[in-house]
Amino acid sequence: MPMANLLLLIVPILIAMAFLMLTERKILGYMQLRKGPNVVGPYGLLQPFADAMKLFTKEPLKPATSTITLYITAPTLALTIALLLWTPLPMPNPLVNLNLGLLFILATSSLAVYSILWSGWASNSNYALIGALRAVAQTISYEVTLAIILLSTLLMSGSFNLSTLITTQEHLWLLLPSWPLAMMWFISTLAETNRTPFDLAEGESELVSGFNIEYAAGPFALFFMAEYTNIIMMNTLTTTIFLGTTYDALSPELYTTYFVTKTLLLTSLFLWIRTAYPRFRYDQLMHLLWKNFLPLTLALLMWYVSMPITISSIPPQT
């Protein structure tokens, strides 16, 4: 039975990820006054499956100078971690109900850095290595703000368990009392998933694709799949933390409908940003985090820590 549950979680995620790729190409197409993929199947709906067949039937290239073990392990690790992050997410019932669910997500997502670092180093290419170093610095930096924002929300919910966040938001979304945190969280998730305007790791103009330049066929597809799975996961987590949906035992299907709708809207915002914004300069990216986000999040964390103490110390008004 646990294996069936695991498959029932993984298969829909992979299908959603495939259609997210198609949706992105369609949105980019219409934003640029063209059609996008519209040949394979009705309205191009079978395009993701055609791409998958093409990539996985091609011969994978292994550069002669690369470190083969790490070169093959890196993309596999990237997708494994991307799928593993879904286990504690309540939709409305998690696959594994962890008491430290948020801590698990934070710790596991930081492991994704290793797959990028290994891929860049094992490729034995200057472009790949520079792209990997950029991606690692960016991901580690933005994890700092993500952790502080999570701590601030934990002070409001009182537990590391993600299911508790749903109970906390029965009457009021956490987005309303903590909207500055929510805005910084959303921008940090863009940076964490290496998306526009923070896609410096894949800077086509200067790095010719970045850390995955030496990859082709199946391993390249695995990196792509991991990236898009992470996008959906991050938006699902954002929905759980800031836009919590009330769970009604009498009509559980309503929870799923609202939950999926919010996640789709956030994911569409990711794609819209991709079409509209240019790429940041690397120094601007780091300046935004260390000079702006970090002081702000620390100040807000102190505010959320001190508020309950201050209120509890006020004598009752008789």
Swiss-Prot record:
Location, primary (coarse class): mitochondrion
Summarize the impact of L285P.
In LHON; uncertain significance; secondary mutation
- Give the transmembrane region(s): 2-22, 68-88, 100-120, 146-166, 171-191, 231-251, 253-273, 294-314
Membrane disposition: Multi-pass membrane protein
EC class of the enzyme, as a word: translocase
Function as written in the Swiss-Prot or TrEMBL entry: Core subunit of the mitochondrial membrane respiratory chain NADH dehydrogenase (Complex I) which catalyzes electron transfer from NADH through the respiratory chain, using ubiquinone as an electron acceptor. Essential for the catalytic activity and assembly of complex I.
Q: What name does this protein carry?
A: NADH-ubiquinone oxidoreductase chain 1
